[in-house]
Amino acid sequence: MMFREMRRNKQLLSAEETAAVLEKGTSGVLALAGDDGYPYAVPISYVFDGNKLYFHCAKGGHKLDAIRRCPKASFCVIDQDQIVPEEYTSYFRSVIAFGTIRELEGDGEKRAAIEKLARKYVPNDTAEGMEAAIQRDWAPLCMLEMTIDHMTGKEAIELVKAKKAQ
């Protein structure tokens, strides 16, 4: 599939800046093809690793039903959204990624993914603490992996101009 070019390409973030937004972010919105043709967009925590995003969820529900029906998804993270009332605008920075999601099946890949997520959100935990948390939540846990096919980052033109002025 060909992905659309961003219309305002002067506002395009570099690949490094785009990856940095995903590495820094703590939550985003996962958009899926939902029931009866309605989009289903759900806020979710994640971890970014290379060209993959990892999410956790329960072993059943709307999200998994949608993914099983159609594994294509988009994921959006807003890094900055500073409202500037006197200019009738916002100074924003965001990323959108498109890709395909799969449920991680084997215990090994599921475990590797949940450990990445745990290290992101609880970086100072002990190995024993992380192990206890993973074991406690293991039975109902489903891990998802989104392989990114295309992603772009964009920022407000005012931020682009400010960078050039430095």
Task: Identify what each model region corresponds to.
Residues 63-92:
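Helix-adjacent hinge/juxtasegments
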Residues 21-22, 66-67, 117, 146:
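A generic structural signal for nonpolar/aromatic side chains embedded in well-ordered alpha-helices
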Residues 1-24:
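Extreme N-terminal tail/first-helix region
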Residues 2-10, 82-166:
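Charged, gly/pro-rich active-site loop segments
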Residues 23-25, 38-39, 88, 139:
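Short solvent-exposed loop/turn micro-motifs enriched in small/polar/acidic residues
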Residues 15, 60-61:
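Structural motif corresponding to alpha-helix initiation and N-cap regions
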Residues 25-59, 75-76:
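Short beta-strand segments
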Residues 27, 41-43, 72, 92, ...:
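Broad gene-expression machinery/nucleic-acid interaction feature
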